[in-house]
Amino acid sequence: MLVNAIRQKVSEVISKAYGSEIEFEVEIPPRKEFGDLSTNVAMKLAKTLKKNPREIAKEIVKSLDEDPSFDRIEIMGPGFINFFLSNELLRGVVKTVLEKKDEYGRENVGNGMKVQFEYGSANPTGPFTVGHGRQIIIGDVLSEVYKELGYDVTREMYINDAGKQIRLLAQSLWARYNQLLGVEKEIPEGGYRGEYLVDIARDLVNEIGDRYKDLWNEEVEEFFKQTALNRMLSSMKDTLEKIGSSFDVYFSEKSLIEDGTVEEVLKLLKNKDVVYEKDGAVWLKVSAFIDEEDKVLVRSDGTYTYFMTDIAYHYKKYKRGFRKVYDIWGSDHHGHIPRMKAAMKALDIPDDFFNVILHQFVTLKRGGEIVRMSTRAGEFVTLDELLDEVGRDATRYFFAMVDPNTHMVFDIDLAKAKSMDNPVYYVQYAHARIHNLFSNAEKKGVKFEEGKHLELLGNEEERVLMRNLGMFNTALKEVAQMFAPNRLTNYLQSLAESFHAFYTKHVIVDPENPELSNARLNLALATGIVLRKGLKLIGVSAPERM
């Protein structure tokens, strides 16, 4: 809100004075003596106008000098313009939050553009890992924020239910089933050794007895494929429910083969003369688009590669009407990006359609020591286990609070701590304190009137808190522009910090001063609205008592 207001005022001045439109930053300066907000617009304009940036800054300041939104405006260093905001402008933020309530922060940036976030996608061959958990939360937060900014968002999970890994899953389950029946069967090379398959096999023995004991044919293979798939997908959805995540679409890789999409795309590529046959396989001319080797689409045995079905999947996304798609992948898949972009180009799909957000890996820490992510063959720390230990709120918040581009160390002890050192506790405690203020006011007979006596707000802690409330929309736009959920958690930490400082230094509920109490309760109420909304966008609760 505040950044938008400053940007609009400055833009009007430079448009009128120089006939220019230019992108520039407005942000909170590093030190409070530099004002409430600062801009580098004069330096940006200096390059275009070939003028001294301080001279440009002086002209801008002169045009804004009489504006009641500012107590004063100062020029710093090479041409930074520092704004000291008026109490009137800051009080207006509180008024706006109280009027808009849960609508506060919403802005129609996307204008209904149809976008898709695809994340959490995995082979349904085992439980979600903590790495999947990080990806799911990144996708959830970005989806929520994009909706808040006026985009038509679809959340989608791609189910890799075709190909050799599903056959290996079926063979692995069949081996476990036979082992329980006393038949020695080896899990195939590259198969799945996790204990979770023993549990499914045990259920099968109870359900069908020895029907498929030491028997393997097409019918048996299909039975074990479907059984394993259904059980794994059901388990994955249970985990998603536990972490508080849901998808609009679960898209089957197998469906792309069954409905003819893969063949349609292969035919399109052949017609565009970007494929060729060699050694009995069909290859895409990746090298015609980027400096990379050509890739196989159809193997010599006639089966499709993952690359082929992935191209078909993204072609179908385009045909479904999405203007932009955002795939969230682990950083180990970065090599797949250029060849996918080459494939999109080969299909004449716009360059800005296909986008990938990469995230780094997760390491768990307990008692100051790194937790071994893998115990014995086929076993690893699952997302379910992490959720059981630290709970949904801490899991979601901790995954959101680290930049996706940074390797994450998830401190289990800190996530469980009921102390102000725990970031999610710190923010939630601010919300609980606010709720308690209103209970306290009622007990002390202080009558609350919403929106009244805001003119009494203006000390240093109140100003910082009001300014931070005015930065909520800016934080949301940073999340969207940088694909960084941590921009929202950083904002909430800052807002909670400024509230705790205000709460600690000042008497908020004072029966001897009901008007000032009202003003401060209104500021607290506005803060609670924004904290609650920010936490909701992350999928974290806002408790009223702690």
From Swiss-Prot:
Tell me the GO molecular function terms.
Answer: arginine-tRNA ligase activity; ATP binding
The record's comment on protein family reads: Belongs to the class-I aminoacyl-tRNA synthetase family.
Cell compartment(s), UniProt: Cytoplasm
Q: Which UniProt keywords apply?
A: Aminoacyl-tRNA synthetase, ATP-binding, Cytoplasm, Ligase, Nucleotide-binding, Protein biosynthesis
Q: What NCBIfam families does this protein's entry cite?
A: argS (TIGR00456)
Q: What is this protein called?
A: Arginine--tRNA ligase
ATP-binding recorded as keyword? yes
Alphabetized CDD domains for the sequence: ArgRS_core (cd00671)
- Membrane-crossing segments per the record: none
Query: Which Pfam families has this protein been placed in?
Result: Arg_tRNA_synt_N, DALR_1, tRNA-synt_1d
| Record's catalysed reaction(s) | tRNA(Arg) + L-arginine + ATP = L-arginyl-tRNA(Arg) + AMP + diphosphate
Q: Which Gene3D superfamilies match?
A: Arginyl tRNA synthetase N-terminal domain (3.30.1360.70), HUPs (3.40.50.620), Isoleucyl-tRNA Synthetase, Domain 1 (1.10.730.10)
Kindly give the HAMAP family that the UniProt entry links to this protein.
Arg_tRNA_synth
The answer to whether UniProt assigns keyword Disulfide bond to this entry is no
Write out the coiled-coil annotation as residue ranges. Answer: none
Motif span ('HIGH' region)? 122-132
For this record, the Gene Ontology CC terms, alphabetical, are:
cytoplasm
| EC number(s) from the headed UniProt entry | 6.1.1.19
The subunit field of the Swiss-Prot or TrEMBL record says: Monomer.
Record GO biological process? arginyl-tRNA aminoacylation
